């Protein structure tokens, strides 16, 4: 089993170009697995972790409802945003500047074969990261992602999750609002859940801007501990 993960920080990158790159890495891992089974080989499969920040974009999961996007094509254009229907789970979400997006492309057979556990560990990495800023992140029953103030009238989402998996290989991942412009969430019903607010790290801390590189380091630290892996 290969528990080494190749880290790549893609910086500010177009959503479609990043999606294509994810698909390329995802397919590479799948091809090795298929070839191993076909030829009774035991070649190691690679694992990747991509950090990226996207320009303004809305994405809709495969089971999502398009009516949760509250903008017409012209309005999208006026806001300088794009839209894609994609092959992850979940409904609609927003990505943009000031948001930390992580795409782990893992062969879970290197770790454990349990998608539910995988999602919970992604959430846990974010919850532990928030705790370092004295913010209490929690899960909300029946809803993926990381929330604040669950069980109160002020429940709000700070991190969205949506993944795809095939033959235990994962892609897509999480989006943590660090310094995101929350106004862009007004144009959707986030994750298809009505009446729930969104928030960001800088808003919760009452500061103009948080250090995103520092946040990424903390996420990675907790991710490697939870998955018992090494990042190169």
UniProtKB/Swiss-Prot annotation:
EC class name: transferase
Compartments where located: Cytoplasm
Biochemical pathway: Protein modification; protein lipoylation via endogenous pathway; protein N(6)-(lipoyl)lysine from octanoyl-[acyl-carrier-protein]: step 1/2
One CC-aspect GO term: cytoplasm
Annotated TM spans: none
Record: residues binding substrate: 88-95, 160-162, 173-175
Residues annotated as catalytic: 191 (acyl-thioester intermediate)
Pfam families for the chain: LplA-B_cat
GO MF, any single term: lipoyl(octanoyl) transferase activity
A GO biological process held by the record: protein modification process
EC numbers for this chain: 2.3.1.181
Domain BPL/LPL catalytic: 43-231
Site residues by UniProt (Lowers pKa of active site Cys): 157
The reaction(s) this protein catalyses: octanoyl-[ACP] + L-lysyl-[protein] = N(6)-octanoyl-L-lysyl-[protein] + holo-[ACP] + H(+)
Alphabetical keyword list: Acyltransferase, Cytoplasm, Transferase
SUPFAM superfamilies: Class II aaRS and biotin synthetases
Similarity comment: family membership: Belongs to the LipB family.
Further details from the record: In the reaction, the free carboxyl group of octanoic acid is attached via an amide linkage to the epsilon-amino group of a specific lysine residue of lipoyl domains of lipoate-dependent enzymes.
HAMAP family: LipB (MF_00013)
Function: Catalyzes the transfer of endogenously produced octanoic acid from octanoyl-acyl-carrier-protein onto the lipoyl domains of lipoate-dependent enzymes. Lipoyl-ACP can also act as a substrate although octanoyl-ACP is likely to be the physiological substrate.
PANTHER family, alphabetized: OCTANOYLTRANSFERASE
Protein name as it appears in the record: Octanoyltransferase
Organism encoding this protein: Flavobacterium psychrophilum (strain ATCC 49511 / DSM 21280 / CIP 103535 / JIP02/86)
Lineage: Bacteria, Pseudomonadati, Bacteroidota, Flavobacteriia, Flavobacteriales
